Amino acid sequence: MVVVLAVSGISTASDYQQGELVIGQVESGTDVWLDGVQVQVSDTGLYVFGLGRNAAPGVTLATRLNNIRTETPLFVKQRSYLEQKIDGLPSKKVTPNAESTQRIRSDNQQIGEVRQSHSQAHWLGQQWIQPVEGRISGVFGSRRILNGVPKNPHNGVDIAAAEGTNIIAPLAGQVALVHEQMFYTGKTIMLDHGLGVTSVYAHLQHIEVSLGQVVKQGQVLGQVGQTGRATGPHLHWGVTWQKTHLDPLLLVN
């Protein structure tokens, strides 16, 4: 996580990279834009934005206060991502049937509604912690090509751990989604951390929080499982800013 401080102008770090969440502070009443798109600013002047998997090498951060506008180019380090090709799979392993497709659409709609949140209340500004300790079995941004068909990139990280291991909240937030059986992700929780930042926890064995509950950093959310489409016990952990997927490991490292 990189911190950008801006008052009348902008002070920037020099090493941004794809998949990163950027947090900034401006004087109250300042407007902020990223590449011409206005960014939400809290009542205290805190703002955040995300640099996605395919963020361009250069983006422009702009602020305006008292009719004085400042623009600063930010240079974004480009990353390479793992790619795995698997051929000869049965078609049902690559393309879901009509019933499954309908379930997937319903799941995606519910997840999308949570990610549209722009609550002013937020729990940002402190260091994130890892929700569970274990081997990183799946990395952000990797992609599988199944029978020649590119699938969506992996939009989070997978952490392998023993079934039943406690999963804790990496940052305080409000429980925005609790689902007992999503098609791909099984038992799933989403937290709203404010200002468009949300996180998801998937394949859980058991859920210990309820919708609307405010959880503290370090509070138990549930336990590691292998529900949904999982080949072994692990936690899928994802973080987004609005609809932009971010690399969770950059938040804790």
At which residue positions do the language-model features occur?
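Cleavable N-terminal signal peptides
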Residues: 1, 10-11, 141
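Cationic-aromatic interfacial patches
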Residues: 7-80
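Extracytoplasmic
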Residues: 17-19, 27, 44, 56-58, ...
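Surface-exposed, glycine-biased beta-strand/turn segments
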Residues: 73-185
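Short, well-structured beta-strand-loop connectors
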Residues: 166-177, 209-224
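Zn2+-dependent peptidoglycan hydrolase active-site motif and core
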Residues: 170-205, 233
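Short, conserved catalytic or interaction motifs in soluble domains
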Residues: 180, 206-209, 226-229
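Conserved, short, structured surface segments that act as functional micro-motifs
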Residues: 187-193, 197, 213-253
